[in-house]
Amino acid sequence: MAQSILIVDDERDIVSMLNQYFCKIGYVVYTAINGKEALNAITKHPDIILLDINMPDMNGFTICEKIRNFVSCPIIFLTARIEDCDKIKGFAVGGDDYVVKPFSVDELEARVAAHLRREKRHGSSAIV
């Protein structure tokens, strides 16, 4: 069964590009362009989440805090924020990785694959 990825970003170009890329290499892709959609998409039980921080209705830190209470899958922040304090906060609220825009899609794919391999070794990413 194909692994699934949830992409949460208010920049539609990024969502579209990542959607096409990950679909092409065999992932089932779910997308959300704001916090409300992201919270609804969690019910699809993605294996991994790519999460922007800067969004108009709810920032990625808040989304991560809210979903971390019932989702154990890896969360990779994908953001333009480069400050160490933002990276530290991202990990503090439950993020597993932090990738700064602009990013290499190949590197992002490698990080996604590494996190999913780790999850497979340590158990499922089921909702707890």
Q: What residue ranges belong to the model's regions?
A:
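Conserved phosphotransfer cores of two-component systems
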Residues: 42-46, 66-73, 93
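Acidic catalytic/metal-coordinating carboxylates
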Residues: 33-34, 59-62, 86
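Two-component/phosphorelay signaling modules centered on CheY-like receiver
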Residues: 12-30
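Acidic, metal-coordinating helix/loop segments flanking the phosphotransfer/catalytic sites
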Residues: 31-48
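Short, Lys/Arg-enriched segments at the junction into DNA-binding effector domains
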Residues: 3-4, 114-128
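Active-site residues of response regulator receiver
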Residues: 9, 52, 79
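Receiver (REC) domain active-site loop signature in two-component systems and cognate sites
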Residues: 55
